[in-house]
């Protein structure tokens, strides 16, 4: 553990941020998994709603610096591709 006051504060702050980031990352992954579950069931309406939620979570993660914008773009593109495949069928 740190001895210097500023280092102690940084350690506390870092731990808070780590917990917050883990929470946001978990919520993002959960939203994606929910979407993929609806795609498996071929439930178009619920899949469309879940896609919107997952897209928002990905965009929010980019804004907060959790993931890179290209990573979010790639994930959204793949999710959209899955959504379009069940809409077409």
Swiss-Prot record:
In alphabetical order, the GO MF annotations are: small ribosomal subunit rRNA binding; structural constituent of ribosome
Q: Which GO terms describe its biological process?
A: translation
Coiled coil start-end? none
Q: Which Pfam families match?
A: Ribosomal_S20p
GO CC term, one of those recorded: cytosol
Compositionally biased intervals (Basic residues):
7-20
Chain segments carrying region Disordered: 1-25
Cross-referenced InterPro entries: Ribosomal_bS20 (IPR002583), Ribosomal_bS20_sf (IPR036510)
Q: Which UniProt keywords apply?
A: Ribonucleoprotein, Ribosomal protein, RNA-binding, rRNA-binding
Q: Function, please? A: Binds directly to 16S ribosomal RNA.
Family, similarity comment: Belongs to the bacterial ribosomal protein bS20 family.
Query: Could you tell me what this protein is called?
Result: Small ribosomal subunit protein bS20
Query: From which organism does this entry originate?
Result: Geobacillus sp. (strain WCH70)
Give the lineage. Bacteria, Bacillati, Bacillota, Bacilli, Bacillales
